[in-house]
Amino acid sequence: MDMMLLVQGACCSNQWLAAVLLSLCCLLPSCLPAGQSVDFPWAAVDNMMVRKGDTAVLRCYLEDGASKGAWLNRSSIIFAGGDKWSVDPRVSISTLNKRDYSLQIQNVDVTDDGPYTCSVQTQHTPRTMQVHLTVQVPPKIYDISSDMTINEGTNVTLTCLATGKPEPSISWRHISPSAKPFENGQYLDIYGITRDQAGEYECSAENDVSFPDVRKVKVVVNFAPTIQEIKSGTMTPGRSGLIRCEGAGVPPPAFEWYKGEKKLFNGQQGIIIQNFSTRSILTVTNVTQEHFGNYTCVAANKLGTTNASLPLNPPSTAQYGITGSADVLFSCWYLVLTLSSFTSIFYLKNAILQ
């Protein structure tokens, strides 16, 4: 009813405008009886895709200088001739020439998505062109799992949610240390996570409208400490020597040293202890007989404790004993050979004299 009154007012002031509005009224759902629609066999339909934030130009041309046009979006009139009915400052009519009656929408948003109709009123019959504007939206990750710290063996689900038009595809990748790709999907399930599966996980949302949106999640996996190696260098009395203990664990383990049942402390009896995240080094600045014995390295964190032992013995004297025995043995054989030689000469001399 309001539209008809508007048309009647337009008739009083401008006959061509009334004609245009009447033709547009046929396109408005509010002007049609329930369950009926109007199909214009002469109407051209076009589809246009524009990225969000860009400028959309919906082309429409007048037949001659006498024809008039109007633009309609769904049930709202945007322009009628040169009169702007929309209050949106982004909307204008492009007039590159006398026949150009294109609708220009700056900084396109998702709310601009939908059908647009250009109606041109000629001297004979109205001509209608329809354009369906599709606003494409670059992918945007709006929700992703926070960085997490969990214990080894726990089930983990990583979440990555994104928006975009077309709807973006979601993919996951374990970028450190393995760079392993996973199947696509918003959720990444890891059952019984292991220490090897710790690191950074990358979520990528992509829909070919723009560059993929990429976010990362850091996963820390706690596990009980292990000692991978305990090893010593040569321990020579009067010189310095060291024992190295290599371990692993998350959180990093705390190291302790024992000699027999006695706990060792840094600076005690010429001992220096240096602890790092994955190793501990025990240095004896001046090795004496009292430093030899059984040493134990202990590594502990909140998930457990482990240890490894190494016997530290004085340098072996076997080398010197073997050398001495050889000298004595050689001397004995030399003596035997000498005595035998003299005996042989003595018997040979007697035989000649006889």
Curated annotation (Swiss-Prot):
GO cellular component: plasma membrane; side of membrane
GO biological process annotation, one example: cell adhesion
Domain Ig-like C2-type: 38-134, 139-221, 225-313
Modified residue annotations for Phosphotyrosine: Y187
Predominant location: membrane
Positions of the pro-segment in this chain: 325-354
Lipid-modified residues, GPI-anchor amidated glycine kind: G324
InterPro entries for this protein: Ig-like_dom, Ig-like_dom_sf, Ig-like_fold, Ig_I-set, Ig_sub, Ig_sub2, IgLON_domain
Keywords attached to this entry: Cell adhesion, Cell membrane, Disulfide bond, Glycoprotein, GPI-anchor, Immunoglobulin domain, Lipoprotein, Membrane, Phosphoprotein, Repeat, Signal
Cellular compartments annotated: Cell membrane
Family: Belongs to the immunoglobulin superfamily. IgLON family.
Protein name in the entry: Neuronal growth regulator 1
Organism taxonomic ancestry: Eukaryota, Metazoa, Chordata, Craniata, Vertebrata
Gene behind the chain: NEGR1
